[in-house]
Regions:
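Structured alpha/beta reader/binder surfaces that contact nucleic acids or chromatin modification marks
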Residues: 1-128
């Protein structure tokens, strides 16, 4: 059974396919090729709420980097912000939003996870 990974702050971007990169605090154990179960929300569920699966993803690339690397290299930052599902948002705005929502500093070391969604067959079974 794959480990859950929540997209509670970016569910629309995940679902519309505009997001293929996510940054996380921790997640240092991941390796290229790992398969994860994307979910709408994994923590903080109220009584009676259930985890809602969004689909399976495969890790294509994973590395650790400073969150504010996006601001140090603006060309990189512009591409990364778009890959996070926020085209047109500034690099600085994204970094400050992430730092605030994750209670970290803009220069925190984060895990950058690039992923691909696994296709589903007609029976709803994910395909490798």
């Amino acid at each position: 059974m794959p480990r859950n990974i929540s997209f509670s702050m970016t569910t629309p971007q995940f679902l519309d396919g505009s997001k293929d990169v996510t940054r996380r605090m921790g997640w240092t154990h991941l390796k290229t090729g790992d398969v994860l179960q994307a979910v709408e929300k994994a923590m903080g569920l109220k009584k009676g709420e259930k985890i809602k699966p969004l689909g399976l993803i495969r890790v294509v690339n994973v590395r650790r980097e400073p969150l504010n690397q996006m601001c140090a290299d603006l060309a990189y930052g512009e591409k990364e912000v778009a890959r996070e599902g926020f085209p047109g948002r500034s690099e600085t705005d994204f970094v400050l939003w992430f730092a605030d929502s994750h209670h970290c500093k803009p220069d925190a070391i984060v895990t950058r996870i690039e992923f691909e969604r696994l296709p589903i067959d007609v029976k709803g079974v994910p395909q490798p």
